[in-house]
């Protein structure tokens, strides 16, 4: 571990020096000296020197408006470079992530040694493995795409420098390139000028596929196959591709008026166009490689020329022309041209798979397996993973939009107001219409704009090639009729197959009622016939945590999942739980392995479907090597959770969790909902109002333009508290509940739960992570600089609570300090703090200046505004998450 720290620190130090040289060249020695002084004061302040802490505050408070931006940019860019160095070291030869494929082999060996597990059972579990990662734009990823490309190349240079056999000339060339990249990054504006459109967000997702996943997935499957062969002597079938990628970019219209039916249609076409582009590159390589003449009769027949000397090349050239004609058609459609569909248009994966697989089988049969298992196998696996759609999309819409659409139809037909009907009457009407052969909507009817948009979206889903839409997700689902309503609207649009429709249960009450809703649905014969033994349910993490606090929310999520698993098992239904986790702890984020093993037994039998959000996509899938590491981690955790499920919790533990949940929820809501001073304190102690100015994503920050905390989306709510380092949503109520239960005499049981129950130990681990990133003196400084003195007592109360919560968690975990069992993460946080602290202090100063200017009725100072945006991006980089 120490070797890794020193290697990482030396890279961080080298990149820091290159950045310093760049700043000196660009702005002169004086600015660099100022930055260096601030860095040294910050380091000394972190080491406990109070005099230097005061000097740090005074230096940053006294910066002129002209100095603000260069200083903010220096520390923000340094944190971006630190993140690159850390990401590289997770996959470097002596890094943590590089060991993940080996960890997979260790998992296989551990499973083999279990007395009650046969090798056949392990191979069967492996064969049914299913992992679907849903990329979402919520864009907490605030780094511009142009900067990301430069940072990826920095990573590549670090990798080259690790080679031991470099000549002096080669070393000098790599260092020269690094200097160029650091200079390019410095001279590039890191803040977007405009909010991205939903199409921009989708393009960002396609860039992740092109730059990382396209290479990473086949490489991961090669490594997986090698590990399985080493452990069991078993070769994975060619069509075994347990990983799929779906996207919400261009499909998630919940609270986002910018995502329309036309946008979804455009993104679907753009995605298919990008797929043709990437497959054309693969086919070009295969045309070059597959020059052999010996083949099976099937290949001869497929190539259409019995005399062909190079039959494989003929087939590849035919595929190339089919891809090119499809690409040209899609390019025309994207420009709005009305075109006749070409006869050979690619709309289904089988059109690519069958010719490629025929060639694969022929090469194997003719003794050329070594060639078959090269580029051709990689392309076959890409067809299975990405295929013609490239990334499938989910459509997500709020339940009330469907209710309002159907109510408009029933009123027009003279049937009354659907919205005012009882749940039983709604269900009876919906089932009657679902069984009816006539259309629901009359031809001459003109719907309102809102209803037309809902119906048009369903039509887009019906027009899309089958398999392009992965699921229809209903946010704020509360009743069986919410699910039946969507099935009726999809039927009306012309969908003649059972598209997965997933209710999303996201508030505390909805999670508690989830099992009742699904039980009622599964008791409807028509519904059971439709779903053919498969059901997807989405569990919301972020909104439930905002509603009730993390402790109560995580317990409600656990119980909802447990009840749904048992209900579906009893009904003979395969349940896929879709986890709507965020990157931050307050939105359900946790290290993948720990998070999966802490779920209820049986929760992964139907596979894992999970959202990957914003900046976490770049951290986990930004490079092919990182992709391999992340997918290996998920694979091992799913297998382990399915074959060695955690024990059912003891009855007394459930009782303790009920108590913890009740106490924590009461305290959390006592502050957030009921304390008269809480909202004014939140608005002044955090940059919540200023965040709205940041061009973060296509979706508005609030569900309603007016309103308090409850109307704020979960992401800006978390983001704001992350910025001022109080991290409040990720801990409020949890530690106090633990303290209360200890005082009730249950410390021994809490320690046993921490030791023997993965669900509980993961909760505590997540709290420790948050506490490590929180900072009392910085949170206090924000109060002193920004908050009215009348609200200071509330701030002090919250900080005292945080301090007491930290002690409670350390007592139960029997640790002297935070993150004792994860020194690598503790080291990473410590390394960043030296650079994040000045950004936090500077941010408080900038907020102060900006608000004073506003109060005086003056025009905002562009230098202050720009520097403020840079500090927000910089702190996000330092915390390694936004919302």
Curated annotation (Swiss-Prot):
One GO process term, biological-process aspect: oxaloacetate metabolic process
HAMAP family cross-referenced by the UniProt entry: PEPcase_type1 (MF_00595)
Keywords in alphabetical order: Carbon dioxide fixation, Lyase, Magnesium
Keyword Lyase in annotation: yes
Keyword hit for Nucleotide-binding: no
Gene this protein is translated from: ppc
A GO molecular-function descriptor: phosphoenolpyruvate carboxylase activity
Protein name from the UniProt record: Phosphoenolpyruvate carboxylase
Active site per UniProt: 138, 546
This enzyme's EC code(s): 4.1.1.31
Domain of life of the source: Bacteria
Bridged cysteine pairs (disulfide): none
Described function: Forms oxaloacetate, a four-carbon dicarboxylic acid source for the tricarboxylic acid cycle.
A matching Pfam family: PEPcase
Family: Belongs to the PEPCase type 1 family.
GO cellular component: cytosol
Cofactor: Mg(2+)
Catalytic activity: oxaloacetate + phosphate = phosphoenolpyruvate + hydrogencarbonate
Organism, as annotated: Erwinia tasmaniensis (strain DSM 17950 / CFBP 7177 / CIP 109463 / NCPPB 4357 / Et1/99)
């Amino acid at each position: 571990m120490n070797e890794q720290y020193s290697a990482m620190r030396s890279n961080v130090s080298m990149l820091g020096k290159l950045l310093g040289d760049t700043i000196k060249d660009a702005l002169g020695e004086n600015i660099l000296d100022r930055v260096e002084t601030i860095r040294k004061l910050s380091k000394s302040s972190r080491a406990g020197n109070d005099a230097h802490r005061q000097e740090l505050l005074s230096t940053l408070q006294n910066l002129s408006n002209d100095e603000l931006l260069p200083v903010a940019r220096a520390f923000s860019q340094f944190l971006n470079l630190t993140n690159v160095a850390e990401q590289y070291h997770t996959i470097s030869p002596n890094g943590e992530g590089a060991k993940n494929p080996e960890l997979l082999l260790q998992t296989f060996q551990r499973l083999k040694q279990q007395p009650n597990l046969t090798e056949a059972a392990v191979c069967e579990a492996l064969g049914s493995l299913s992992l679907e990662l849903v990329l979402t734009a919520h864009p907490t990823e605030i780094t511009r795409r142009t900067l990301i490309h430069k940072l990826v190349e920095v990573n590549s240079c670090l990798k080259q420098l690790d080679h031991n056999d470099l000549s002096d000339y080669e070393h000098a060339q790599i260092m020269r390139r690094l200097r160029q990249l650091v200079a390019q990054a410095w001279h590039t504006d890191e803040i977007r000028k405009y909010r991205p459109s939903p199409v921009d967000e989708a393009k960002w997702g396609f860039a992740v596929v092109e730059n990382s996943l396209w290479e990473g997935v086949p490489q991961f499957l090669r490594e997986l196959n090698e590990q399985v062969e080493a452990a069991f002597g078993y070769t994975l079938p060619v069509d075994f591709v347990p990983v799929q990628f779906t996207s919400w970019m261009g499909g998630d219209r919940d609270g986002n008026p910018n995502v329309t039916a036309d946008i979804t249609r455009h993104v679907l076409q753009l995605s298919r166009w990008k797929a043709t582009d990437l497959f054309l590159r693969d086919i070009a390589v295969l045309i070059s490689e597959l020059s052999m003449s010996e083949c099976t009769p099937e290949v001869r027949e497929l190539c259409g020329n019995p005399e062909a000397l190079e039959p494989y090349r003929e087939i590849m050239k035919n595929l190339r022309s089919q891809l090119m004609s499809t690409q040209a058609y899609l390019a025309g459609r994207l420009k709005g041209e009305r075109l006749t569909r070409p006869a050979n248009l690619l709309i289904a994966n089988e059109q690519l798979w069958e010719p490629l697989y025929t060639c694969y089988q022929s090469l194997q049969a003719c003794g050329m397996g070594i060639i078959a298992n090269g580029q051709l196998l990689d392309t076959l696996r890409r067809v299975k993973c990405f295929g013609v759609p490239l990334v499938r999309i989910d459509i997500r819409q709020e339940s009330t939009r469907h209710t309002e659409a159907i109510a408009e139809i029933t009123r027009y037909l003279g049937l009354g107001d659907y919205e005012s009907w009882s749940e039983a009457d709604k269900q009876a009407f919906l089932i009657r219409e679902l069984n009816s052969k006539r259309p629901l909507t009359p031809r001459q009817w003109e719907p309102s704009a809102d209803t037309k948009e809902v119906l048009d979206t369903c039509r887009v889903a019906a027009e899309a090639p089958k398999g392009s839409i992965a699921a229809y997700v209903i946010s704020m689902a509360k009743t069986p009729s919410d699910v039946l309503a969507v099935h009726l609207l999809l039927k009306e649009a012309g969908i003649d197959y059972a598209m997965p429709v997933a209710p999303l249960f996201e508030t505390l009450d909805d999670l508690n009622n989830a099992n009742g809703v699904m039980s009622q649905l599964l008791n409807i014969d028509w519904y059971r016939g439709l779903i053919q033994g498969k059901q997807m349910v989405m569990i919301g993490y972020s909104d439930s945590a905002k509603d009730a606090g993390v402790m109560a929310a995580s317990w409600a999520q656990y119980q909802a999942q447990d009840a749904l698993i048992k209900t579906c098992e009893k009904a003979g239904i395969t349940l896929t739980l879709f986890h709507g986790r965020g990157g931050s702890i307050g939105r359900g984020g946790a290290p993948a392995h720990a998070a999966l093993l802490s779920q209820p037994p049986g929760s992964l039998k139907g596979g894992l479907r999970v959202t990957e959000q914003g900046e976490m996509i770049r951290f986990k899938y930004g490079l092919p090597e990182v992709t391999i590491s992340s997918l290996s981690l998920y694979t091992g955790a799913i297998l382990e959770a399915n074959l060695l499920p955690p024990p059912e919790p003891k009855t007394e533990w459930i009782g303790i969790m009920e108590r913890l949940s009740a106490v924590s929820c009461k305290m959390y809501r006592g502050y957030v909902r009921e304390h008269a001073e809480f909202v004014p304190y939140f608005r002044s102690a955090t940059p919540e109002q200023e965040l709205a100015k940041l061009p973060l994503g296509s979706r508005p920050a609030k569900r309603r333009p007016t309103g308090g905390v409850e109307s704020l989306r979960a992401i800006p709510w978390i983001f704001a508290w992350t910025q001022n380092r109080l991290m409040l949503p990720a801990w409020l109520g949890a530690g106090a509940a633990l303290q209360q239960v200890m005082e009730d005499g249950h410390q021994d049981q809490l320690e046993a739960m921490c030791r023997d129950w993965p669900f509980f130990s993961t909760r505590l681990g997540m709290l420790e992570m948050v506490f490590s990133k929180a900072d009392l003196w910085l949170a206090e400084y924000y109060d002193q600089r920004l908050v009215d003195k009348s609200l200071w007592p509330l701030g002090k109360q919250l900080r005292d609570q945080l301090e007491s919560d930290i002690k409670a968690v350390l007592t139960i975990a029997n640790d002297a300090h935070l993150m004792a069992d994860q020194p690598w993460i503790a080291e990473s946080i410590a390394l960043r703090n030296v650079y994040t602290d000045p950004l936090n202090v500077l941010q408080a100063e900038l907020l102060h200046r900006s608000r004073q200017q506003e109060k005086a009725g003056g025009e905002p100072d562009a230098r202050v505004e720009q520097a403020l945006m840079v500090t927000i991006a910089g702190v996000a980089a330092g915390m390694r998450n936004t919302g």
